Amino acid sequence: MPDKSQELPRNPTLGEVFSVISGLCMVSDFHKNIRIKVMGTLFLPPIQLNQFRIWYDKDGPTGFVVWAFLSEEVAERYKNGIPVQPHEWQSGKNLWFINFVSIRGSLKEKIR
């Protein structure tokens, strides 16, 4: 069971959520070289739309996921390496998990 002092407040600010997510990125081998400006582009739209989840254990945050609901057109562009634009995060009905970080624990236990 997580230590509640390690979790975000009930109604966290955009800055509080972004701080946790960017902190997790900084210790992720895959994400640690992403510039903060790029992190903003990747993570602020889903945070603003409440399309994220952060996991915690007794030592603090352990991972997060952000998702989008993409139109067919946006999904095709995304599959071809074109990033989702801020106005496209809710462009359709197709659920896409855009980014996932897990620094402790298995991915399998997080997605249950």
Task: Please name every model-derived segment.
Residues 47-64, 68-69:
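Conserved beta-hairpin
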Residues 38-44, 50-54, 80-87:
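Short secondary-structure capping micro-motifs at structural edges
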Residues 4, 32, 37, 58, ...:
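Context-gated lysine
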